[in-house]
From Swiss-Prot:
<dbReference type="GO" id="GO:0009376">
    <property type="term" value="C:HslUV protease complex"/>
</dbReference>
<feature type="binding site">
    <location>
        <position position="39"/>
    </location>
    <ligand>
        <name>Zn(2+)</name>
    </ligand>
</feature>
<dbReference type="InterPro" id="IPR027417">
    <property type="entry name" value="P-loop_NTPase"/>
</dbReference>
<feature type="binding site">
    <location>
        <position position="36"/>
    </location>
    <ligand>
        <name>Zn(2+)</name>
    </ligand>
</feature>
<dbReference type="InterPro" id="IPR038366">
    <property type="entry name" value="Znf_CppX_C4_sf"/>
</dbReference>
<dbReference type="InterPro" id="IPR003959">
    <property type="entry name" value="ATPase_AAA_core"/>
</dbReference>
<comment type="function">
    <text>ATP-dependent specificity component of the Clp protease. It directs the protease to specific substrates. Can perform chaperone functions in the absence of ClpP.</text>
</comment>
<keyword id="KW-0479">Metal-binding</keyword>
<dbReference type="GO" id="GO:0140662">
    <property type="term" value="F:ATP-dependent protein folding chaperone"/>
</dbReference>
<dbReference type="InterPro" id="IPR003593">
    <property type="entry name" value="AAA+_ATPase"/>
</dbReference>
<feature type="binding site">
    <location>
        <position position="14"/>
    </location>
    <ligand>
        <name>Zn(2+)</name>
    </ligand>
</feature>
<dbReference type="GO" id="GO:0051301">
    <property type="term" value="P:cell division"/>
</dbReference>
<keyword id="KW-0547">Nucleotide-binding</keyword>
<dbReference type="GO" id="GO:0008270">
    <property type="term" value="F:zinc ion binding"/>
</dbReference>
<comment type="subunit">
    <text>Component of the ClpX-ClpP complex. Forms a hexameric ring that, in the presence of ATP, binds to fourteen ClpP subunits assembled into a disk-like structure with a central cavity, resembling the structure of eukaryotic proteasomes.</text>
</comment>
<dbReference type="Pfam" id="PF06689">
    <property type="entry name" value="zf-C4_ClpX"/>
</dbReference>
<keyword id="KW-0067">ATP-binding</keyword>
Amino acid sequence: MFKFTGEDKGQLKCSFCGKYQDQVKRLVAGPGVYICDECIELCNEIIEEELSEEVDFELKDVPKPAEIKAILDQYVIGQERAKRTLAVAVYNHYKRINLGSKLDDVELQKSNILMLGPTGSGKTLLAQTLARILNVPFAIADATSLTEAGYVGEDVENILLKLIQAADYDIEKAERGIVYIDEVDKIARKSENPSITRDVSGEGVQQALLKILEGTIASVPPQGGRKHPHQEFIQINTTNILFICGGAFDGIDKIIANRVGRSGLGFGADIRSKQEQNVGELLKQIMPEDLLKFGLIPEFIGRLPIVVTLDALDEDALVRILREPKNALVKQYQKLLQLDNIELEFEEEAVRAIAKEALRRNTGARGLRAIIEDIMTDVMYEVPSRTDVTKCVITKDVVLKKQEPILVTTNDAKSRRTKKEESA
């Protein structure tokens, strides 16, 4: 007696495992292919297993707050409170992302960060270093170039394009990145009261940023620029992107001082002059109402729940910045001359003089490079051509009086050696 196979019966079969229709419970049809219920179940198991492995790896991969701060200490001098707050905020943010793939009754909300501090206090450096620690895509955007949709300038979606480019167009990777929006204080509305005229580069930009800060699926033009109807867009979910907004917020210390002064009136008030309370102390007392008075809209403030304040850098901090970090400027210039077999030495008084000049210019740590570059340009121009120079010494007079640095040559070394031999 003959036994008919599925093929003889003209039955359909699974394109993956080859089983016929009568050998499985269900066969799902696609364009020219079929898949059985057993293969579907196996695919689901493989995907779930891979996802759980990926999540477990990420949980182990995120450094603890103390580890994040320890690495920040290697690059950023001072700002202890700011580094602690940022370390905790970033750690919690990535814990929240990892929890998101698991079913849980507690939903953790997104916590974007607002950084306030004088120019050159380390806002951008902190954000860059965080991205390097976590090995995630990082993009810097300038809020002053943004305008409301439909006006000349950049759309807010162009910020996300920079992040996508930093992730080499890997959307999944970009969706876990960090975006630093600089000069966010420049998009404050021009007056405290709502305006009847359109403020396209101030309040309008704040309104446009609300959705991407909170979390939305944004349509990003792949080539940047303005959107137009006959264009394909890149879809990116901003729910798990950490936004750090930074700004100097010049003048907000006066707003805080006025509020603190009003609350301190009457008998038993702690009377302190403005000179006694420096800007750093005042910024630590910042409240949402101060940001509102400065010109940020309530919805924008609400989407930046973590406020980090940075102190102005003093002379000692600037001296440490010049010498201590891994990428310290003194170390960088020493390395540059070392490549020409020349030893570079900065005397302690010279380093102090550079720090004082940066304070005088009121440029913070950012101004240090300009001062050193001015000192070193002639040296770096002349010295590589001379084979007799072995050492270059930068003194206080080189910084303050624009004198020539001390160049130690092989002849000097020989004469010193001869004198030692003669005295012996």
